[in-house]
């Protein structure tokens, strides 16, 4: 995760640095076994079964995916019958998403917009969507869950739903090498600085990715939930999971497709969580 402190962050805009890193990951991720774009295209896969079980039938609904990266998950919902819009601050990711939509044959019901989350309502329109979808690894990259919640509430029609699945903030407080607490669970104004090389999708892609740092902010569960309640959302369910979808720590053990857990012999803690909320 992070290496503590922020070093020379005063001379670096964290969001600019993050955008630079995400732009550089796009070709690596599109080609990676982790994302398996070729298999996804060939097999016509839709959304993950566990996510579809929570959201149910999305046929004919308007769905927006915030921080969509290169759009693979977004387009899975298009294959399930939704009209989708993906938003991401990486122009390289948006270009790749538009190309993937064409290759998947769903470009007629998929729109992709390059913009930061804080501009979502202004650019996409208020009360336009039935579903806001946010998937793993999103909350960390924005300093304010309050601003994000305002965008979520503004994008949804009355009765519209937020689906959020993300890394559990407790797991983000763990040391990279063991199960000790190394970082704060609660939000702080100063971001963490992460100077690791490679990527979660391809840790060996050292030469293809810059060694420049990225920056992130941890957000406790209560902070995230309260921000949503404050903008008129109703919390429908909150589930904590003892698994996560990627091997973000070297000591995790793979037990199934996109499922990694703490090894036997250690106490279990939540590694990810799922939240469903409704705009009232």
Model-derived regions, located:
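N-terminal, positively charged/glycine-rich alpha-helical extensions of SAM-dependent methyltransferases
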Residues: 1-37
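Conserved alpha-helix/loop element of class I SAM-dependent methyltransferases that forms part
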Residues: 33-62
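Class I SAM-dependent methyltransferase SAM/SAH-binding core
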Residues: 61-121
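A short acidic, Gly/Pro-enriched loop at the edge of an enzyme's catalytic core
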Residues: 118, 122-132
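A short SAM/SAH-binding and catalytic strip from SAM-dependent methyltransferases
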Residues: 130-146
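A short glycine-rich, Lys/Arg-flanked "PGG" loop and its adjoining helix->strand segment in the class I
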Residues: 146-161
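Conserved class I S-adenosyl-L-methionine
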Residues: 161-203
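Short alpha-helix
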Residues: 214-238
